[in-house]
Amino acid sequence: MTTTLRRGETGSLWDRFCDWITSTNNRIYVGWFGVLMIPTLLAATICFVIAFIAAPPVDIDGIREPVSGSLLYGNNIITGAVVPTSNAIGLHFYPIWEALDEWLYNGGPYELIVFHFLIGIFCWLGRQWELSYRLGMRPWICVAYSAPVAAATSVFLIYPIGQGSFSDGMPLGITGTFNFMLVFQAEHNILMHPFHQLGVAGVFGGSLFCAMHGSLVTSSLVRETTETESQNYGYKFGQEQETYSIVAAHGYFGRLIWQYASFNNSRSLHFFLAAWPVVCIWFTALGISTMAFNLNGFNFNQSILDSQGRVVNTWADILNRANLGMEVMHERNAHNFPLDLAAGEVLPIALQSPAING
């Protein structure tokens, strides 16, 4: 006689679904934020791929002069982009059912991609916090991830809101991003904004600190292998002993620069490595969000004059000329002519005609 013991089914279908969603034993953690993250990121990705390949030209300026951005309409991987929603739409919510005939022409895919993408990365951030909570970890992973989330939100949502149209959002492409950067510099002088300068310090400084830390650790590994073996074999996942000598790294760096320029605490060191770029990128996102409402970077529009009233050219004048040139090239239509050019005083080019002696 054979007796079979079967584990009884406990709980309702909903309870089992909840247990599966929040289980940390799954190969990929889903979580409640993942329930919303997965469909939104899938929708954004699918729409982006289709639009990048086959979307028809978009009337970005709202004046019936469409601009093509897809591969099938003459672009390549470098020049291709998902063109932002038309200026004729402004800040209106523009779902596909609002204008089936003109949705593609007015750049509807851009709004669809951006909105779903932003919701998706917000949920990814929440999912990071949720998984950390389930595992009993501290929440600093999602705090660090909030920096790129804030940066993406500032260029895709806050800046268009401040400028009054989603046509001013960053195009979804390589050269589209470069064009956005040039126009941003022309209209807001972002290079002269302290918060952007902090962001540059965060990105380049973070790269420098990462390279310094990695090279110091790699150079001070505790020898566990012979010369003929890879040094990576000297580490076993989960081992208790240190794999490198922080004392040696501290001594080297302290003698190379200055004693107090080197960390002697591994925890404070890694906190600094995380905090430096995160805080600086926070400030950059804040700077873009303020420039969205035209609180721009420093300007040096008043040239230095000598005793005769003549301009003494400085680097600020060169920067101003570059900004005005980029702004004129960007605004392709007379009715959008830059106000800082159209409203300025007329400056004489020459006080008198030169004499021509034949």
Curated annotation (Swiss-Prot):
Family, according to the entry, reads as follows: Belongs to the reaction center PufL/M/PsbA/D family.
Which residues would be cut away as propeptide?
343-358
Whichever gene encodes this chain, its name is psbA
Keyword Magnesium appears in the UniProt entry = yes
- What post-translational modification information does the record give? Tyr-159 forms a radical intermediate that is referred to as redox-active TyrZ, YZ or Y-Z. C-terminally processed by CtpA; processing is essential to allow assembly of the oxygen-evolving complex and thus photosynthetic growth.
Q: Which organism is it from?
A: Mastigocladus laminosus
Q: How does it assemble?
A: PSII is composed of 1 copy each of membrane proteins PsbA, PsbB, PsbC, PsbD, PsbE, PsbF, PsbH, PsbI, PsbJ, PsbK, PsbL, PsbM, PsbT, PsbX, PsbY, PsbZ, Psb30/Ycf12, peripheral proteins PsbO, CyanoQ (PsbQ), PsbU, PsbV and a large number of cofactors. It forms dimeric complexes.
Manner of cofactor binding, per the entry note: The D1/D2 heterodimer binds P680, chlorophylls that are the primary electron donor of PSII, and subsequent electron acceptors. It shares a non-heme iron and each subunit binds pheophytin, quinone, additional chlorophylls, carotenoids and lipids. D1 provides most of the ligands for the Mn4-Ca-O5 cluster of the oxygen-evolving complex (OEC). There is also a Cl(-1) ion associated with D1 and D2, which is required for oxygen evolution. The PSII complex binds additional chlorophylls, carotenoids and specific lipids.
Task: Detail which positions bind a quinone.
Answer: H213, S262, F263
Question: What name does UniProt use for this protein?
Answer: Photosystem II protein D1
Site residues (Stabilizes free radical intermediate), renumbered to this chain: H188
- Where do the TM regions start and end? 29-46, 116-131, 140-154, 195-216, 272-286
